[in-house]
Design a protein with these regions (language model features):
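Glycine-rich helix-loop "coupling/hinge" segments at transmembrane-helix boundaries
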Residues: 11, 22-27, 37, 53, ...
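Amphipathic cytosolic juxtamembrane alpha-helices at the membrane-cytosol interface
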Residues: 2-4, 54-58, 62-90
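Generic hydrophobic transmembrane alpha-helix motif, especially the helices
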Residues: 1-55
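Hydrophobic/aromatic positions within or immediately flanking transmembrane alpha-helices
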Residues: 17, 33-36, 63, 75-76, ...
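Transmembrane helix boundary and interhelical loop/hinge segments in multi-pass membrane proteins
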Residues: 52-61, 159-166
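C-terminal transmembrane helix and the adjacent membrane-cytosol boundary/short C-terminal tail
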Residues: 26, 30, 39-40, 86-94, ...
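A short glycine-centered flexible hinge/capping loop motif at secondary-structure junctions
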Residues: 68-70, 114-116, 166
Length: 169
């Protein structure tokens, strides 16, 4: 319960504020972006995993393993992790577009990936600055961000349909 209260406190403030604050404190860079995004994105995964484990804990096969004297670590390894893995994989594929968009947004603001490295957000920013020279410099990276986001959302939706036993017919 203590960890969930901590997660709720972190989730009460928009993650973009945390990320921008960490970017300002730690300076721009790829490592900083990875740390900043990972420091905020784990909270939604924690809620999903907790809910799934609480649901699985009430299943008959888990209760049978407990009654037969199985150790908690054995139950976690043999029952909870394999049965929660589908939800975890689906959640990861649904989180990837948000992470890509967050990184692109930070780079568009100029606090993301530094200049020698390419980023979708920095490409959109460069295209925006040169919009009068050619709209394609702005449209192509923006379209690619949309395409990647759509692809990962469709992948996550397909994986959810394939891995969720409640949706199987």
């Amino acid at each position: 319960n203590l960890m969930m209260r901590f997660v709720e406190i972190i989730m009460a403030i928009p993650s973009l504020i945390y990320i921008i604050l960490l970017m300002v404190v730690m300076g721009p860079g790829i490592k900083t972006i990875i740390i900043a995004i990972a420091a905020t994105e784990w909270t939604s995964m924690a809620l999903i995993v907790r809910g799934e484990v609480l649901r699985l804990k009430e299943q008959e096969y888990v209760m049978a393993a407990i009654n037969l004297g199985a150790s908690p670590s054995w139950i976690i390894i043999k029952h909870l992790i394999p049965n929660a893995m589908g939800q975890i994989i689906v959640r990861i594929t649904m989180d990837v577009p948000r992470v890509i968009f967050t990184e692109a947004f930070l780079s568009f603001l100029g606090i993301g990936v530094p200049a020698p490295f390419a980023s979708l957000g920095s490409l959109v920013l460069d295209g925006y600055r040169l919009l009068s020279n050619g709209a394609h410099l702005f449209i192509i990276p923006a379209f690619f961000i949309s395409l990647v986001t759509l692809a990962f959302n469709l992948l996550g939706d397909g994986l959810r349909d394939a891995l969720d036993p409640r949706l199987r017919k």
